[in-house]
Amino acid sequence: MFSNNNRISTRQVFRLFVFDFVGESTLILPSQLAAFAGNDGLASIVLGGIMGSLYLWYLAYVLKKMETDLVTYMERILPAWMKKILLVLLLVYFTGMAGYGAYIFSDVIQKGLIAGESFPLILILVLLTAGYAVCGGIESRARVYEILFVVLFVLLAVMLLIAAGDLEMEYLYGFFQADTGSVMKGSLAVFFCLMPLFLLAFFPSYVQKAKWGKLVHAVHAAMWFAIGVLADRKSV
């Protein structure tokens, strides 16, 4: 049984953020890490995860001070005109991120699944699907991800086990063979893919206040789960 109360559980939060972290990053990070750090990509992944942990700690500290979600806090302390400007900036930011993600997924679909199909048509269908999901709200999205999580990650585990025979062990021992600047570029690329952490600022309104601490722990666990998936992908 599901309840329609505009609330989601911390378990659903964990699964939501895992999909947000893993979805796009597994498509773009392998090539970026290979270009930036070569065999040292694993070090970049770990450093990017540490940067993400520090950023999450800062977000948790700010949310504790605000005692509410970001939008409600802006309504409380800012004049209406300034709040509207910030909301427009947030809209531009999220539109840009969503557009980039839609472009990446459409490109992968065209090249890997239906080669020769019109790219604009694929992109339009991806955007329509995303728009339909947004209209369903966060609670509907959480329900879908809760169902898909086990199925998709069991399949992922099976694929990784099959690929274990192609494991390149030297990737696991390449720490800091590349120069520090290259490793840092790779870690910044990883940190960029962890930017969905910022969404934590909007989640307090969907989780009971008594569970805010568990909310942060769920997001942190999701981030390191995704880091583990990325590290495994880098080693294969």
Predicted segments, located by residue:
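Perimembrane loop-to-helix junctions flanking transmembrane segments
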Residues: V71-L78, Y173-S182
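Membrane helical hairpin/interfacial module
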Residues: V22, T26-F119
